[in-house]
Amino acid sequence: MTRKITSGKVSRRMLLAGSAAGAAAALSSFPAPAIAQAEPFRLGLLTVKTGPLAQGGIQMEQGVLTYLKETNYMIGGRKVEFTSADTGGNPAGTKTKAQELVERDKVDVILGPLAAFELYAISDYIREQKMPTLSLAAADNLTQRLPNPYLLRASATSSQAMQPMGHYAATEMKLKRIVTLSEDFAFGYEQMGGFQAAFQQDGGCIVNKLWPPLSTPDYTPYVAQIGDCDGVCQGFAGSNPLRFMKAYASAGFKFPVVTGETGGDDALLKSYGEEAIGLVGCCPYTIDLEIEANQRFINGMLKNFETIPGQYAALLYVNCQVVDAALKATGGEAIDKDKFMAALKAVNLTDTPRGPLKFDHLNNVIGNFYIRRIGTEGAKYGLKLWNKTIKTYENVSQFWTWPEQEFLAHPVYSRDYPPLTKC
């Protein structure tokens, strides 16, 4: 399903109008001419509304709408026409919807998609079309060994949050032997690969790697395979972390559990029970970040949708800030795609819900990543559970602590790389 949205209502084709307000950016190399654009700025979103990834996909749309409502439906001094497309969470559907956004709806920018396998499916197409795309999808190689010049990522690669998590698990939690579990697709492979590489670098060992399918109704058979270890790393996405943590607790295991950006997402806190207490995760966004930009974002989500935001909403809101800053830098001009991409890459923001960010030369974000522990202390907004930040890793790049060329000399993280070694 594809829909165009304005002021919370749905119609076939509507313009979003209002006054401008946007994010600050350091873009001195792009002097901004006077903005005089009669045409609307067409913003397209590829997201997921059905299936196990739908919870995050719905929050993606809410994050965009929260920003548009805050700015009175203006970006870069131009009225916005916003089209939201449901990919169905599969590669074929994603490509079809991308083609519709580009060829039928004539969008100026695509936000999304959600899943790494979706982004891999459309990478060649967006390159051919020279379509500026700000993707939440964390497909590592598209800002590494196979960089796409029309892709910008303001969220994280799949492995980017898991690398500091691996370091923290080894050096501060003092874990030695871990079993990893994540979905049997690209995001899962790349998450667990990043965790394994960093964990092993700091003296840890991976005992086993388990790969349940994305649509696994019951994780009990996989929990039963955990075996001899002193910790577990889960990288499930969407609503799957809820089922896994319940199965884990029901089995009576007491080993510490660590996770990445999706397994401890703030939006899951209202659905988690006692089984999640003590879960330690690493994320590029955290609800407890006490800065004005984050409070403004949270208040907007509560006002507009009466929901607690997580990283899916927050990072799409940040993507809108990036687009707004770049469009202001070009004076509202986005017809020249290469010029607009150059402006996007040059964005350097300090006032975002996730904290400061900038981009590396391969178009991936450099920003803060937060280690959080779920507990009851400090809970707000009617929640019983809360993510409390216990450590901040600043200016984290996709290459972690490795020199870029050394990192890129290795294969992309996969189901089999890094390989298991004897513990």
Predicted ranges, named:
Residues 1-10, 17-29, 35:
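N-terminal secretory signal peptides
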Residues 55-62, 74-145, 211-220, 242:
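Beta-alpha junction/loop-to-helix N-cap segments that form part of ligand/metal-binding clefts
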Residues 348, 352-423:
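Solvent-exposed, acidic/polar segments of extracytosolic/periplasmic ligand-binding ectodomains
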Residues 30-48:
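C-terminal segment of N-terminal export signals and the immediately downstream linker at the start
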Residues 96, 140-142, 149-251, 287-296:
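Extracellular/periplasmic Venus flytrap/periplasmic-binding protein
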Residues 44-67, 85-91, 114-115, 181-189, ...:
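Extracytoplasmic "Venus flytrap"
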Residues 194, 238, 243, 289-347:
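Extracellular/periplasmic ligand-binding modules, especially the Venus flytrap/periplasmic-binding
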Residues 101, 105-114, 134-136, 179-182, ...:
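Periplasmic-binding protein-like
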